[in-house]
């Protein structure tokens, strides 16, 4: 296995891109923050992209660097959004597995966020 890599997942959500992206940017309870801390590196509200750097003692046992990037684009008027979530990583050593479990947990989180937005009554 290589030390550096990237994993990416593409999926659709039912929410409009603006609402979904705003909810993600404003959320302070992202699941990948449980084992460390996150620092926002870049946010583009027009393009609906964001990159975060993850760190902390638990993460640093396995990864020298771990960054997540999201891009949200509208499918069409009232048709939901496409989401691309990518992790760029550098492992501490080659025997560490790629962070597939973090990707899987992230998708579950995004689906729950989508449902919460859809069920929210203003």
Swiss-Prot record:
InterPro entries assigned to the protein according to its UniProt record, in alphabetical order: Bet_v_I/MLP (IPR000916), MLP-like_ligand-binding (IPR051761), START-like_dom_sf (IPR023393)
Gene Ontology biological-process entries: defense response
Protein source organism: Arabidopsis thaliana
Name assigned to this protein: Uncharacterized protein At1g24000
